[in-house]
Amino acid sequence: MAEGQVLVLDGRGHLLGRLAAIVAKQVLLGRKVVVVRCEGINISGNFYRNKLKYLAFLRKRMNTNPSRGPYHFRAPSRIFWRTVRGMLPHKTKRGQAALERLKVLDGIPPPYDKKKRMVVPAALKVVRLKPTRKFAYLGRLAHEVGWKYQAVTATLEEKRKEKAKMHYRKKKQILRLRKQAEKNVEKKICKFTEVLKTNGLLV
């Protein structure tokens, strides 16, 4: 991958810890990483167990002054960001610089809706978990511990998918019309095509 190029990852269907470990390594190597659809990230283990773990974490606070931390994030993107932070030496200059190269988002807002999104096979749930194993969605966990924007994100995602579907239909129609137009003029331009081919201008 070229230096300065942004790696856009689709978080949906990936396991939280495995994806975080790979992302942490990439940002330390100097690559810019954007993770979209963090609400679709999976966590291994059943939902109830994961919720109990997070509720136990919410009780961790500074007795004398809770505003000093630890801070408990509710948005799926921030929960994922904190997981990655735990895998980086974030109190050093190198770790801070690496963390600045990471961008996390709920849903797929512009301009990332128009960009090619990648997956990480080594972190995919379907590859890593047995089909019978239980798992939870980070979006649902976040919603049940205080994230307020689950419905908003879902609505925006539906709109984006509908828009993408329409764009794909339009693209297919244009390709079909182009093919038909080429077929219509094939006989008329065949002699010119032959000349171009003999001169090596057309392959």
From Swiss-Prot:
Subcellular location: Cytoplasm
GO cellular component terms attached to this protein's record: cytoplasm; cytosol; cytosolic large ribosomal subunit; GAIT complex; postsynapse; presynapse; ribonucleoprotein complex; ribosome
Modification N-acetylalanine, positions: A2
Sites of Citrulline modification: R59, R140
Gene Ontology MF annotations: mRNA binding; structural constituent of ribosome
N6-acetyllysine, modified sites: K191
Residue stretches in coiled coil: none
Phosphoserine: residues bearing it: S77
Disulfide bridge positions per record: none
Complex and partners: Component of the 60S ribosome. Component of the GAIT complex. Interacts with EIF4G1.
Name of the protein in question: Large ribosomal subunit protein uL13
Originating organism: Mus musculus
High-level lineage: Eukaryota, Metazoa, Chordata, Craniata, Vertebrata
Gene: Rpl13a
